[in-house]
Amino acid sequence: MKKTGLVLALLCCVSLLFLSVASGARAQGDQFYKGKTITIVIGSTAGGFYDRWARLFGRYMGKYIPGNPEFVAQNMAGAASVIATNHVYNVAKPDGLTVVMPLNGVYIDQIVGRSQVQFDLRKFSWIGSPSIEPSIMYMRSDAPYKSIEDIVKAKVAPKCGGSGTSSTDFILSSILEEMVGAKITSVLGYPGGTEIDLAVEKNEVVCRSHSVSAHFGREPFDTWHKKGFDRHLIQTGRKRDARAPDAPTLLEVFERHKVPEDSRRVARMLLAAGELGRPMMVTPGTPPERVKILREAYVKVLNDPKARDEAKRSRMDIEPTSGEELEALIKDIFDAPPELIARAKKVLTN
């Protein structure tokens, strides 16, 4: 009995010590964020869906973080958000006060070894993503290309706008060129989606690829659709979106062109950006208890009735992915066989 009592006493002491440490960590978190400001660095220009989501989180996350910090949004567009990601990786302190929302294809630039990349995405702590984002390619309706087959047969390649080599615009165009023989001229360097859409209106370029949710969720597309300004050529979702029933899926096009499985695996890796959605990450080295606080607040925002209503009114779809799931996806991407990564590099550098 004495031995049993001693064991119980020791267990109680250990439990109390654990609770004390946990409470202390939470108290430190409470104390740390009080009176502080968290900066959300956005890897694109104002007005697009990345910007919208960042500002929505900025309006709601503070009330779910102990100490109720303020949030500010900072747009840092350029090089398909490589500039923003470099900044948060190399300049921002690892204190939980700076998060970044880069374009979801930013991992591509690291995979292919672009010289501008000064980060390792595997070292970030991933907070979450509000939605999964399949893509769609649109074309000016007055351009002489009514389908992907027209682009394959084209004597003059259409010009498609993009922000950089990790943008959906460039990735999907490169896949179509390499795997089905499409002819596309990518015009890169636009700061963000808003500028590409303006270039399409000016007829500087005639096509663009971006998320389905943005294409059916904001201007100028609402007006374009009413006027018949654009048509839809292809989409990357598993099935056709009800809003674009005329556009075949990439899988359908692959079937038609008998694209082999090894090429399809490369395409899946390059289009994993859609699974990443619109991710938020925090500086590498941020204390785990602060990462936990940010992740919990992120989830609570996506369950907040007012935040959900605001997202719905703005036609921003909610299909969240946790930070842990995003980290696992990034690990899978970078753990791909060397031959698969080599083929991906070939697709994007041809």
Task: State each model region's role.
Residues 39-54, 77-80, 161-168:
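Extracytoplasmic "Venus flytrap"
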Residues 104-116, 170, 174-179, 202, ...:
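A ligand-binding cleft/hinge motif common to bilobed small-molecule-binding domains
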Residues 21-27:
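Sec/Tat signal peptide C-region and signal peptidase I cleavage site
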Residues 120-130, 183-189, 220-273, 322, ...:
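Short beta-strand->loop
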Residues 9-20:
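Bacterial N-terminal signal peptides
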